[in-house]
Curated annotation (Swiss-Prot):
UniProt cross-references to Pfam families, sorted A to Z: Ribosomal_S6
Annotated transmembrane regions: none
Any GO CC annotation of this UniProt entry: ribosome
Parts forming coiled coils: none
Function: Binds together with bS18 to 16S ribosomal RNA.
InterPro entries with a match to the protein in the record: Ribosomal_bS6, Ribosomal_bS6_sf, Ribosomal_S6_plastid/chlpt, Transl_elong_EF1B/ribsomal_bS6
GO molecular function: small ribosomal subunit rRNA binding; structural constituent of ribosome
NCBIfam families cross-referenced by the UniProt entry: S6 (TIGR00166)
Protein name: Small ribosomal subunit protein bS6
Family: Belongs to the bacterial ribosomal protein bS6 family.
Gene3D superfamilies the UniProt entry points to: 3.30.70.60
The organism of origin for this protein: Limosilactobacillus reuteri (strain DSM 20016)
Length: 98
């Protein structure tokens, strides 16, 4: 399978402490790396207001990860664990054009 570029955007709940947020980001970056992905960039985008409440929150911190991988294993594991995390309100995985 050929190497493809992906962008993952996820929203972190706004009331999380800064230390817990950086642990969360590190944990999910490690999940991607441990499953064969190469992370090119992982950064906070900004805290933004939502158009509608998500899990009773009206704003959240957006985090963006750019990565490359040649298998779906890293993406599937990220997707599975992000669904269970109460600290991640929403997430989206997008395949970028080569």
């Amino acid at each position: 399978m050929e190497t493809r570029k992906y962008e993952i955007t996820y929203i972190i709940r706004p009331d999380i402490e800064e230390s817990a947020k950086s642990e969360l980001v590190d944990r999910f970056d490690k999940i991607l790396a441990d499953n064969g992905a190469t992370i090119a960039d992982s950064k906070d985008w900004s805290t933004r207001r939502f158009a509608y409440p998500i899990a009773k929150y009206t704003e959240g911190t957006y985090h963006v990860v750019n990565l490359t991988t040649d298998s779906d294993q890293a993406l599937n594991e990220f997707d599975r664990l992000a669904k269970f995390s109460d600290d991640i309100l929403r997430h989206m995985i997008v395949k970028l054009d080569a």
